[in-house]
Amino acid sequence: MYTYHKATENGMTLHIIETDASNIRPAQLLKTSNLKGSNEYGINGGWYTSTKPDDNNYNILNIAVSGGRPVGGGVNNKNEPRDGSVSTVGKHAIFYTGSYMGYMEATNYEDLPGVKGNSRAWAQGGVAMSLGNQNWVSVVNKAVDVNSDHEGLSAIVVNLDTNKV
């Protein structure tokens, strides 16, 4: 279902999980779980926040769609959706329809062609996406200090020719 390998680039150790786009399933793990403590494998794909320390309702701040539907159920205190249907930070998304993978500028999942209501579709928005930018390595190197002590940085890379993620 996936292959794993490790590489080093500019002093940073990269742990790479490669799979077909059809295997991707964005999910909301809530506060009761985290990726390490779950039965899932993958990466943290988006930004989120919690409105109260004692509730289980994260506000998802990027597009996050699985099976053609937003993965969450949150709203903010202005009753605006924070369920993965819209991006409030970042304005690009990667999406897969079951046969086509693409990327585009979008802040609402309904704007992604072939995603809404499609049981085979997924979409993930993000803040620092360099979609279609030939200089993406330079952009990432400027954004990430490889000498910092931060752990857990994650990224999604897609190959539109092979539908590999």
Which role does the model predict for each range below?
Residues S22, A27-Q28, N56, T107-E110, ...:
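Polar/charged alpha-helical tracts
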Residues D20-N23, G73-G74, N108-Y109, G132-V137, ...:
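A short linear-motif detector with a strong N-terminal bias
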Residues G42-G45, A93, G102, A123, ...:
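Small-side-chain structural scaffolding
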Residues W122-V165:
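A mid-sequence, solvent-exposed acidic-amphipathic segment
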Residues M1-V86, H92-T97:
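Zymogen propeptides
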Residues V86-V139:
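Hydrophobic, well-structured mid-protein blocks that either form specific transmembrane helices
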Residues N56-G67, T107-A121, A143-V144:
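Short, surface-exposed, charged loop/turn segments at secondary-structure junctions
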